[in-house]
């Protein structure tokens, strides 16, 4: 039964009863124990502070609908611009989000131009790649299973000439990765539809075309690729992240393992006929993301985001990895490129027990020298290094783990008003929401806090793509229905005055005398407190304002609900009648409200009811109600009328009396 709002009595209804499942259905003891364990685990997870503190809906005008449902989208945005390009089915959408104005959209049609297909679902032209090339936009799509590319210049579409194999897959459902670096192009897309079933990482444009050996990866799912410019140009590396089938077939071993692979960008292939067209510097290492304290392992890599060091030190680039386990719980582990590089440079090879050849496998050679055949043969037969890549920090554990299933991540490095640096993670969930998580401190003593859950769309849907514009401090997200621009600050969602603003621990926001504002929009210094356990104590007023008193008159023996909005999921909510606790709602409660149900109102249940929110040492009164008997309420109403009549009488008589006194 849906609770009526406060102020309305509930209609009569039978008392709810809870049946004991084991007793009712005679479940076996082992299953009963499993049920008890599952309920206890679910309850424990509900108390985790890794969940978002509040939930917020982005109500801005920066939403634009597609002209049709788009089951597959690709997003392209250039930092600092107001434009977003989105590739859909036979269309490229150009969205414009000017500051302070409504968003607009233009559409360019790019239909199928050739090819024949048997499955009608694959007969469209699904755009899978958008990339700036010269003064135009390179657009590549499936083109009815005959992948092709076009150049888009000023809304004019021209088909690209020349060999374009490897730029787009044959189906939008295929796992694919394309990396551009200057005139070089790297791809994991097969060139032919009906051969080359084994996935490879290729250089498809550059000095010489190369591909990985067919034995070095087992059914890989590619996640991210990047090029890292190191101290010497010949030492520049290509790193790509993927997961693959676990070669360990032990029934207790995980099905998948997560990897990072390295290649030398200057790799020219080998000397022999077997190695001349292959990458000769391929090595791979396992990415570890596990928590020994809870015995939880997260072995399925979902996404990777690289955050460069602000001083330009490539070794200090932070690699944020989102992992999941078979139960769809998630963890975020952070690695450094320096640690990854060290593992590849110093580790022995797994399963190889002889002396390593010189140059050692994976080593980049100057002056474009070819890799000796012996070095290639050792690396090709033993491509995995023995040492594993572990997270940063002394404990080598995840930054945090959560019961939520995270799928994508972007990270913004920002400075608060006092100059302190924070890393703010934006993680997409399988529920179509975004979690905003702040990380501060050094790798030895990090502070992590889940600020909020953002609902970015007008129409709830899965998030297909996300892009961060650090310059304009915006997120761009797409679903099958719409594209949305979301600001990184959103300070207006925090209620509760100064205390509520500071309790958010949002580094983008601060208290400016009378409201919670973005530090980027305020013209003067604002009050902020991010790390402390008691940020509310920084406010000038020691206590938050009390809730306004609300009164309602009720007849005896009636039913009634009192509702208290649960703004913070980290707080415990208590309904008190006078001094007695009548109802408690614990942290992590998924209900939007803490409800006190009065089934049969008696004389002693009239009086004052207060809903208190307790969050650490922060205590505030969220609701204050007084339940009055109907006869008393009527008496108070009559007394109020009498006072009003008396006041009006004296207001009419006093001028006459005063005038009389003045005359005499």
Swiss-Prot record:
Residues 1-44 form the signal peptide. Residues 647-664 form a propeptide. GO terms for molecular function: integrin binding; semaphorin receptor binding. Residues 542-627 form the Ig-like C2-type domain. One of its GO terms (biological process) is positive regulation of ERK1 and ERK2 cascade. Disruption phenotype: No visible phenotype. Mice display normal levels of lymphocytes in spleen, and normal activation of T-cells by antigenic stimuli. In contrast, production of pro-inflammatory cytokines by macrophages is much reduced. The effect on contact hypersensitivity and experimental autoimmune encephalomyelitis is controversial. Reduced size of the lateral olfactory tract. CDD domains: Sema_7A. Keywords: Cell membrane, Developmental protein, Differentiation, Disulfide bond, Glycoprotein, GPI-anchor, Immunoglobulin domain, Inflammatory response, Lipoprotein, Membrane, Methylation, Neurogenesis, Signal. Highly expressed in activated T-cells (at protein level). Highest expression in brain. Lower in heart, thymus, spleen, testis and ovary. The expression increases in late embryonic and postnatal stages. Detected in T-cells. It is a lipid-anchor; GPI-anchor. It comes from the Eukaryota. Glycans are attached at residues 102, 154, 256, 328, 600. A motif (Cell attachment site) lies at residues 265-267. InterPro entries: Ig-like_dom, Ig-like_dom_sf, Ig-like_fold, Plexin_repeat, PSI, Sema7A_sema, Semap_dom, Semap_dom_sf. A lipid is attached at residue 646 (GPI-anchor amidated alanine). Plays an important role in integrin-mediated signaling and functions both in regulating cell migration and immune responses. Promotes formation of focal adhesion complexes, activation of the protein kinase PTK2/FAK1 and subsequent phosphorylation of MAPK1 and MAPK3. Promotes production of pro-inflammatory cytokines by monocytes and macrophages. Plays an important role in modulating inflammation and T-cell-mediated immune responses. Promotes axon growth in the embryonic olfactory bulb. Promotes attachment, spreading and dendrite outgrowth in melanocytes. Belongs to the semaphorin family. This is Semaphorin-7A. It comes from Mus musculus (Mouse).
């Amino acid at each position: 039964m849906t609770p009526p709002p406060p102020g309305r009595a509930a209609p009569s209804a039978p008392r709810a009863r809870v049946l004991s499942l084991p007793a009712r259905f005679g479940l076996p003891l082992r299953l009963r124990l499993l049920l008890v364990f599952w309920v206890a685990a679910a309850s424990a997870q509900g108390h985790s502070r890794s969940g978002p503190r509040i939930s917020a809906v982005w109500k801005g005008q920066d939403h634009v609908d597609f002209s049709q449902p788009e089951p597959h989208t690709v997003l392209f945005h250039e930092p600092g611009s107001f434009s977003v390009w989105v590739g859909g089915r036979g269309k490229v959408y150009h969205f414009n989000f000017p500051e302070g104005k409504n968003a607009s959209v233009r559409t360019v049609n790019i239909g199928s131009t050739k090819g024949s297909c048997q499955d009608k679902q694959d007969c469209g032209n699904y755009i899978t790649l958008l990339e700036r090339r010269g003064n135009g936009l390179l657009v590549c799509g499936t083109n009815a299973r005959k992948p092709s590319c076009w150049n888009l210049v000023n809304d004019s579409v021209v088909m690209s000439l020349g060999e374009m194999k490897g730029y787009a897959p044959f189906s939008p459902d295929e796992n694919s990765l394309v990396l551009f670096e200057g005139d070089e192009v790297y791809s994991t897309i097969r060139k032919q539809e009906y051969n080359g079933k084994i996935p490879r990482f290729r250089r498809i444009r550059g000095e010489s075309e190369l591909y990985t050996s067919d034995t070095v990866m087992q059914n890989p799912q590619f996640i991210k690729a990047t090029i890292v410019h190191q101290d010497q140009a010949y030492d520049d590396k290509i790193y790509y992240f993927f997961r693959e089938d676990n070669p360990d077939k032990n029934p207790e071993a995980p099905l998948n393992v997560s990897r990072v692979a390295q290649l030398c960008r200057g790799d020219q292939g080998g000397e022999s006929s077997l190695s001349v067209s292959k990458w000769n510097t391929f090595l791979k290492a396992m990415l570890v993301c596990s928590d020994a304290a809870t015995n939880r392992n997260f072995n399925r890599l979902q996404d990777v985001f690289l955050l460069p060091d602000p001083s330009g030190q490539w070794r200090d680039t932070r690699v944020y990895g989102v992992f999941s386990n078979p139960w769809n719980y998630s963890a975020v582990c952070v690695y450094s490129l320096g640690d990854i590089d060290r593992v590849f440079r110093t580790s022995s090879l797994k399963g190889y027990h002889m002396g390593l050849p010189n140059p050692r496998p994976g080593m980049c050679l100057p002056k474009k020298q070819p890799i000796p055949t012996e070095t290639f043969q050792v690396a090709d037969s033993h491509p995995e290094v023995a040492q594993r890549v572990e997270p940063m920090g002394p404990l080598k554990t995840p930054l945090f783990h959560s019961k939520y299933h995270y799928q994508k991540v972007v990270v913004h490095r920002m400075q608060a008003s006092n100059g302190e640096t924070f890393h703010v993670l934006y993680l997409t969930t399988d529920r179509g929401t975004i979690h905003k998580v702040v990380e501060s401190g050094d790798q030895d003593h990090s502070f992590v806090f889940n600020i909020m859950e953002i609902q970015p769309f007008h129409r709830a849907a899965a998030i297909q793509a996300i892009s961060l514009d650090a310059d304009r401090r915006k997120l761009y997200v797409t679903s099958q229905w719409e594209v949305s621009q979301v600001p990184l600050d959103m300070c207006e969602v925090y209620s509760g005055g100064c205390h509520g603003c500071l309790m958010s621990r949002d580094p983008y926001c601060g208290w400016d005398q009378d409201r919670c504002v973005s530090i980027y929009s305020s013209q003067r210094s604002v009050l902020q407190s991010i790390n402390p356990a008691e940020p509310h104590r920084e406010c000038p007023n020691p206590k938050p304002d009390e809730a306004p008193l609300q009164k309602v008159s009720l007849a005896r023996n009636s039913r009634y609900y009192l509702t208290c909005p649960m703004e913070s999921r980290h707080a415990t909510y208590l309904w008190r009648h006078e001094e007695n606790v009548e109802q408690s709602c614990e942290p992590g409660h998924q209900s939007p409200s803490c409800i006190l149900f009065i089934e049969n109102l008696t004389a002693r249940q009239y009086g004052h009811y207060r809903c208190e929110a307790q969050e650490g040492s922060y205590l505030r009164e969220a609701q204050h109600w007084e339940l009055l008997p109907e006869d008393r309420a009527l008496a108070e109403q009559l007394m109020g009328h009498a006072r009003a009549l008396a006041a009006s009488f004296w207001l009419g008589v006093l001028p006459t009396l005063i005038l009389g006194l003045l005359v005499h």
